[in-house]
């Protein structure tokens, strides 16, 4: 349960149908934690791979913060290990290999204990007509909200 969401992967909600989501920890360096606290993280185009029984986050961009230690500059797009139980990793790996599904991060947030957590999801790619359908649905909801708002003002 997120307390404060730092970054959302909006592209994942549009491109994929979310089947199952779960919470995982993430292994970070000190400067990366400071950058995340400052909100300098981007999850767009990031994905999760399971390698040798361990889950890794690839292509997540955590910007370097200039106020941190300057002699060591970490790679901003390095792979980061995810902290999951073995059963969860096995379940995800089975789903990915059998059903040709993917694992993507949805958002990064602070939990109640002020720890940085990553919400990951097992997803299936949407077809083009599904994407168009979701765009139409969003537009209709937006128009209905605007119409209700203007109707409320007239009363």
UniProtKB/Swiss-Prot annotation:
InterPro entries: SmpB (IPR023620), SsrA-bd_prot (IPR000037), SsrA-bd_prot_CS (IPR020081). PROSITE patterns: SSRP. Keywords: Cytoplasm, RNA-binding. GO terms for molecular function: RNA binding. It comes from the Bacteria. SUPFAM superfamilies: Small protein B (SmpB). One of its GO terms (biological process) is trans-translation. GO terms for cellular component: cytosol. Its main location: cytoplasm. It is found in: Cytoplasm. Required for rescue of stalled ribosomes mediated by trans-translation. Binds to transfer-messenger RNA (tmRNA), required for stable association of tmRNA with ribosomes. tmRNA and SmpB together mimic tRNA shape, replacing the anticodon stem-loop with SmpB. tmRNA is encoded by the ssrA gene; the 2 termini fold to resemble tRNA(Ala) and it encodes a 'tag peptide', a short internal open reading frame. During trans-translation Ala-aminoacylated tmRNA acts like a tRNA, entering the A-site of stalled ribosomes, displacing the stalled mRNA. Belongs to the SmpB family. This is SsrA-binding protein. It comes from Helicobacter hepaticus (strain ATCC 51449 / 3B1).
